[in-house]
């Protein structure tokens, strides 16, 4: 048997589709291209498909991953078995617009699961004031400088305590250790009401930190829009790498049509 790791995007209107529904889309795509998936044993066998970290509904991503197990050998040269290099194009043609395979690679036996292995994610999003929020500093000429100062304050702090709600219960967490990087990118428009693009690398252990929690640290009156996950990172020998490129750095295949189909 062979295991193959696939990178894919989730862009456009399909970002409102749940993680479970996206999983069903993939199962249908695998059937359409007639991939020989391995199945679990038992009364109700299921295809051996393992997804990485769930993407919150409403968020986009250009760095989603899943692993599949095949009952036949997967090859990089296409001379026998499954031609992995051709998989992204075949799968993208069988998937709805907005979900596209962008790379595929055979992974080595014993490779940790995505759920276990991903240590952090990079996110980009727009920060804007919540409707009705009182943010006097945001409407001044120095709003960009003020936001930059708040980002610097978070990065220089030894502790960043925020309150979040989980299942109706308020929880208090120190999230500073989970913020690897945080930076301002550029205004999202000519007017402050359009917001500011931010980018951050946030850890996934002991739990996954979200951009919304970072905004609470900057100002509770801010909210996120246009959230996109741009990278997932694993650690190898003290260095971070992308999950798919770790096994065979030179063998990744790309599907440049992905962004076009989602637009």
Residue ranges of predicted features:
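N-terminal, Lys/Arg- and Ser/Thr-rich interaction peptides
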Residues: 1-6
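Short amphipathic alpha-helices in soluble, non-transmembrane regions
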Residues: 78-95, 137-157, 214-215
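A short, aromatic/hydrophobic, helix- or strand-capping loop or linear motif
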Residues: 36-44, 102-106, 161-168, 227-230
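Short, charge-patterned binding micro-sites
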Residues: 38-73
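Ordered, amphipathic secondary-structure segments that act as subunit-interaction surfaces
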Residues: 62-124
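N-terminal ordered "arm"
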Residues: 11-39
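Short beta-strand-to-loop capping motifs
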Residues: 8, 68-76, 125-131, 200-206
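Core RNA-modification/binding signature centered on pseudouridine synthases
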Residues: 145-263
């Amino acid at each position: 048997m062979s295991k193959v790791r696939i990178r894919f995007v989730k862009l456009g209107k399909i970002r409102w589709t749940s993680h479970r529904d996206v999983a069903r889309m993939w199962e249908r795509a695998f059937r359409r291209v007639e991939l020989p998936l391995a199945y679990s044993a038992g009364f109700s066998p299921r295809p051996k498909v393992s997804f990485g970290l769930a993407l919150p509904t409403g968020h986009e991503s250009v760095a989603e991953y899943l692993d599949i197990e095949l009952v036949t050998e997967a090859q990089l040269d296409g001379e026998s078995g499954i031609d992995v290099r051709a998989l992204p194009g075949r799968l993208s043609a069988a998937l709805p617009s907005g979900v596209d395979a962008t790379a595929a690679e055979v992974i080595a036996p014993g490779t940790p699961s995505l759920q276990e292995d991903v240590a952090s994610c990079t996110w980009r999003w727009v920060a804007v004031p919540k409707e009705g929020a009182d943010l006097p500093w945001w409407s001044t000429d120095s709003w960009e400088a003020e936001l930059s100062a708040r980002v610097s304050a978070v990065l220089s702090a030894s502790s960043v305590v925020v309150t979040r709600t989980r299942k109706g219960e308020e929880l208090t967490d120190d999230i500073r250790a989970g913020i690897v990087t945080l930076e301002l990118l550029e205004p999202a428009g000519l007017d402050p009401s359009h917001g500011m693009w931010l980018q951050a690398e946030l850890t996934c252990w002991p739990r996954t930190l979200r951009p919304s929690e970072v905004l609470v640290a900057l100002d509770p009156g801010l909210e996120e829009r246009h959230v996109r996950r741009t990278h997932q990172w694993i650690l190898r020998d003290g260095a971070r790498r992308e999950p798919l490129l770790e096994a065979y750095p030179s063998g990744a295949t790309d599907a440049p049509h992905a962004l076009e189909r989602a637009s």
